[in-house]
UniProtKB/Swiss-Prot annotation:
One of its GO terms (cellular component) is cytoplasm. Substrate binds at Q88, R94, N126, P127, V128, D129, D154, S155, A156, R157, T235. The lineage of its organism: Bacteria, Bacillati, Bacillota, Bacilli, Lactobacillales. GO terms for molecular function: L-lactate dehydrogenase activity. InterPro entries: L-lactate/malate_DH (IPR001557), L-lactate_DH (IPR011304), L-lactate_DH_AS (IPR018177), Lactate/malate_DH_C (IPR022383), Lactate/malate_DH_N (IPR001236), Lactate_DH/Glyco_Ohase_4_C (IPR015955), NAD(P)-bd_dom_sf (IPR036291). Allosterically activated by fructose 1,6-bisphosphate (FBP). The keyword Ubl conjugation does not apply. Homotetramer. It catalyses: (S)-lactate + NAD(+) = pyruvate + NADH + H(+). Pathway: Fermentation; pyruvate fermentation to lactate; (S)-lactate from pyruvate: step 1/1. It is found in: Cytoplasm. This is L-lactate dehydrogenase. It comes from the Bacteria.
Length: 328
């Protein structure tokens, strides 16, 4: 757990497009004092090169130790961030990645735990809700110390899309996407607000959007990744900054409320899955979920989303290899 020492150490596992963008975001924002980057042996030199390149920005930002790391370096880390995994290709859903990325995740988590690591896992590889669950299972860690990026990026996309339509700074638009980080996610329209004014009331007063506009807006948010992947091959800047925000909340013990993939223990009638909902996060991980009162339609969407994730998990855990590796 973090905040037990003044030195703030992050280990990044995976130096691909997401990982390297995350590392750049940490440097730009002056987050963490030490950053180790782990890559597979055949890409070790890339990690060395990225560490060197990033270090050349430190004179413009703040001091930080940056280096190509090994799993042994995880032993005294505050936070291990997992971005490594097979990338989502055009035409693939995040859930299509399950088989490939569960095996990768098992190898990573096993080696991190064997180092003596006793901090917090932050998972961003897709499908993130399933891989957050597998990180919890393979690590044996308490659920509070295994966190997925969840719907943090989706919620940011939602806020920005609304902000652009109504001409308001996105930081003054408060709205959440909940559920799976993927096709079954949903917008929590019942609590969306602009500077404390319910979105419904705002729209009645300003007539910025009609009902069909809102439907189209949500679809554009839900399908944003597919659109970007078709245009440029991958998404990485948005999720990198989302991960940096979560990292700062943990290292600085902010007790910030962020939409993350967190373990469900009956809230919304859902159990035994990690799924996107707001939660308080600080130096010890998840302090507690924030159970926003959903209306009936939203609750049904949450349950349907969880059911899809549960089916994927149940199918995956028929694999004896994953059963044997489970510690939770």
């Amino acid at each position: 757990m973090t905040a037990t020492k003044q030195h703030k150490k992050v280990i990044l596992v995976g130096d691909g497009a997401v990982g390297s963008s995350y590392a750049f975001a940490l440097v730009n924002q002056g987050i963490a004092q030490e950053l180790g980057i782990i890559e597979i042996p055949q890409l070790f030199e890339k990690a060395v090169g990225d560490a060197e390149d990033l270090s050349h920005a430190l004179a413009f930002t703040s001091p930080k130790k940056i280096y190509a790391a090994t799993y042994a370096d995880c032993a005294d880390a505050d936070l291990v961030v997992i971005t490594a995994g097979a990338p989502q290709k055009p035409g693939e859903t995040r859930l299509d990645l399950v088989g490939k990325n569960l095996a990768i995740n098992k190898s990573i988590v096993t080696q991190v735990v064997e180092s003596g690591f006793n901090g917090i896992f932050l998972v961003a590889a897709n499908p993130v809700d399933v891989l957050t669950y597998s990180t919890w299972k393979f690590s044996g860690f308490p659920k509070e110390r295994v966190i997925g990026s969840g719907t943090s990026l989706d919620s940011a996309r939602f806020r920005q899309a609304l902000a652009e339509k109504i001409g308001i700074d996105a930081r003054s638009v408060h709205a959440y996407i909940m559920g799976e980080h993927g096709d079954s996610e949903f917008a929590v329209w019942s609590h969306a607000n602009v500077a404390g004014v319910k979105l419904e009331q705002w729209l009645q007063a300003n007539r910025d959007l009609n009902e069909q506009d809102l439907v189209d807006l949500f679809i554009s948010v839900r399908d944003a990744a597919y659109s970007i992947i078709n245009k440029k091959g991958a998404t990485y800047y948005g999720i990198a900054v989302a991960l940096a925000r979560i990292t700062k909340a943990i290292l600085d013990d902010e007790n910030a409320v962020l939409p993350l993939s967190v373990f469900q223990e009956g809230q919304y009638g859902v159990e035994n899955v990690f799924i996107g909902q707001p939660a308080i996060v600080g130096a010890h991980g998840i302090v507690r979920p924030v159970n926003i009162p959903l209306n009936d339609a939203e609750t049904q969407k949450m349950q349907a989303s969880a059911k899809e994730l549960q089916a994927i998990i149940d199918e995956a855990w028929k694999n004896p290899e994953f059963q044997e590796a489970s510690k939770n």
